[in-house]
């Protein structure tokens, strides 16, 4: 009987640990907690104000496809619902205006992310073609302090 109680207590503890781990992973994915880890810092200087929202959307997509786990742009935490609007010289992310120099902080496997950004005809190449100076720096510890404000889903519902 004592062994059964110990076993039940161990199972309850394992379930609680799994639930805490799942919650932490969900918070990181949603961008609602500060994080740190290996990754890259991408510095973009657009002195001519030639970059459009298209370049930012493309960069965000490349980062996600390369396995980025957390992304910040000019102090704004990006999430799955982030959006870019505006014209060259007047870009906004999630409704907040941003300006050059642009600093992307990205957590993930640094070499994979750096390679993805620097592929031929990729986002870094397109920004350079528009006159921007782009520097991609792999880093052993990127810190992202900003958090995204959670927004309720507009269309998705739980079944």
Stretches with model-predicted labels:
Residues 123-159:
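Extracytoplasmic/luminal low-complexity segments enriched in Pro/Gly and acidic/polar residues
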């Amino acid at each position: 009987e004592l062994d059964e109680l110990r076993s039940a207590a161990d199972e309850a503890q394992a379930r609680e640990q799994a639930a805490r781990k799942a919650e932490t992973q969900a918070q990181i994915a949603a961008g609602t907690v500060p994080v740190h880890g290996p990754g890259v810092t991408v510095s973009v200087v657009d002195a001519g104000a030639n970059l459009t929202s298209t370049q930012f959307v493309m960069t965000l997509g490349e980062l996600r496809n390369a396995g980025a786990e957390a992304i910040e742009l000019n102090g704004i935490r990006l999430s799955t619902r982030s959006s870019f609007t505006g014209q060259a010289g007047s870009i906004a992310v999630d409704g907040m205006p941003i300006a050059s120099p642009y600093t992307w902080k990205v957590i993930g496997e640094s070499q994979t992310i750096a390679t993805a950004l620097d592929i031929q005809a990729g986002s870094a190449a397109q920004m350079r073609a528009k006159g921007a100076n782009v520097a991609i720096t792999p880093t052993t510890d990127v810190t992202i302090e900003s958090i995204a404000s959670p927004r309720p889903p507009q269309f998705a519902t739980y079944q």
